[in-house]
Amino acid sequence: MPTPTRAQLEKWGRGYAELWNAGDKPAWIANWKSVAPGEFRMLDPVGTPEKRGFEECASKPYDLFQPALRLVVPEATRFICANEVTWVMENHFTVDGELIVLRSIENFRFEPDRSVTIRTFYDVPSSDSPLGRFFSKYLPGVA
């Protein structure tokens, strides 16, 4: 199988934030599966234990973060180079009525076997920070 086309990756990239922000988990999953129905691997962020499988890499994080998180990808920070997509994500968390923005660099490498490897870069919030309750669950022993 070939890697996803540029048009497919552009559509997926638009849907990534739009469908997340709409709270439409079934459509968000279908968007993912349209470009990566195979194996998922994720280092989120790089330097933490690797996650594997769609549930660990996408579905469980959606359930944990979605209600408090709005995703923003400025168009000027989105790059598609062959089979890889990279962007600077603005993660807009609302915690106890307060807006907290955490920026991350996110890279997605789509392979011919329709697998994907995700690598992100950000400073993990400490467990005693306003975001600590999320990251203590997401990265136990790290946050």
Placement of each model-derived feature along the sequence:
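Short histidine/acidic/glycine/proline-rich micro-motifs that form metal-
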Residues: 19, 46-48, 93
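A solvent-exposed, acidic/Ser-Thr-rich amphipathic alpha-helical stretch
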Residues: 6, 26-84
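A short, structure-level motif marking secondary-structure boundaries and short turns
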Residues: 13-14, 46, 90
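N-terminal/domain-start segments enriched in small and hydrophobic, helix-friendly residues
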Residues: 9, 17, 42, 51, ...
